[in-house]
């Protein structure tokens, strides 16, 4: 019985680690202000949970965060639930969802992203803006 309980615990821990996200949640204004405009650049997705386009983007954005996970000290991949934080959405002057912006280090001025919603295109944009290469293999 003890072995069965231990095995269940191990499986639960493995599942939790496997589901860990590298996308930093900055929905709280204090968290956003502590990251954006500081020493690392930040790619931020402003989303709403009910938004269909946001839901379709989520897996691509997760892969983007995975591709830059080892470079978190230089570039952060983050998200903000702008529906939950209308004050921050108003401050950024959002007009639709999802809104994707890259904030250079030490800057509150975001560069909007309007390209394809693929991991590859997003990674290329982040690399272009930050000069930081992702861990994604180059296109064939």
Per-region residue spans from a language model:
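Proteins that catalyze or organize thiol-disulfide redox chemistry
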Residues: 1-78, 83-95, 99-140
């Amino acid at each position: 019985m003890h072995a069965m309980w231990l095995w269940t615990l191990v499986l639960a821990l493995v599942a939790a680690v496997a589901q860990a996200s590298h996308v930093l949640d900055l929905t709280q204004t204090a968290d956003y202000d502590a990251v954006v405009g500081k020493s690392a650049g930040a790619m931020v997705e402003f989303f709403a949970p009910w938004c269909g386009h946001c839901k379709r983007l989520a897996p691509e954005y997760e892969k983007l965060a995975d591709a830059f996970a080892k470079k978190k000290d230089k570039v952060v991949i983050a998200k903000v639930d702008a529906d939950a934080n209308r004050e921050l959405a108003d401050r950024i002057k959002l007009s639709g969802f999802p809104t994707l912006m890259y904030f250079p280090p030490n800057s509150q001025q975001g560069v909007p992203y309007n390209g394809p919603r693929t991991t590859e295109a997003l990674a290329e944009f982040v690399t272009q803006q930050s000069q930081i290469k992702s861990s994604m293999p180059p296109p064939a």
